[in-house]
Amino acid sequence: MLGALSVATDGGARPLVLWNRTASEPEGLYVRQAAPVRIGALVAFQVPAPAFPYADRHMSYLRRVPVLKTVAAVSGDQVCTGDDRLVINGEVRAPILKADRRGVALPRWNGCRQLREGEVFVFSDRIPNSFDSRYFGPVNLAEIVGVFRPMALSRPQPGDR
């Protein structure tokens, strides 16, 4: 099973604890913390509207659970997705895949612009096929349900946060 499982909430839709079962971030239990959304922060959010049709058909677990990803760029940063690669502030970060491992076409955010106030770009370089902002574009801060930190990882690895 893949996905982040919300196991406790604050009485609303904002989870306090998440169980991440995807390889794009270390597998394990994460707890929400009072921390700013900044580069390097792990944030949880619902699948953005541009990605929902693909996610609904091919990643149905995301209907129920938030996505957990690392913030790679914030307001003022330049993000480009041309030439089948992600470039942030002039640095090539990763390729952009045309299809998933089943051969299904992935959605794609096409753009080259400075992120606006209230936007972040999320990205994981832990696996080559992470479903992140390369495919659905910037995430609005209003869509973020929290900043999370690892509480108990299943398989800690060097470099894990």
Task: List PLM regions with ranges.
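Active-site loop architecture of trypsin-fold serine endopeptidases
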Residues: 130-135
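Structural motif
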Residues: 41-43, 77, 119
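Phosphate/adenylate-binding glycine loop and adjacent helical scaffold
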Residues: 124
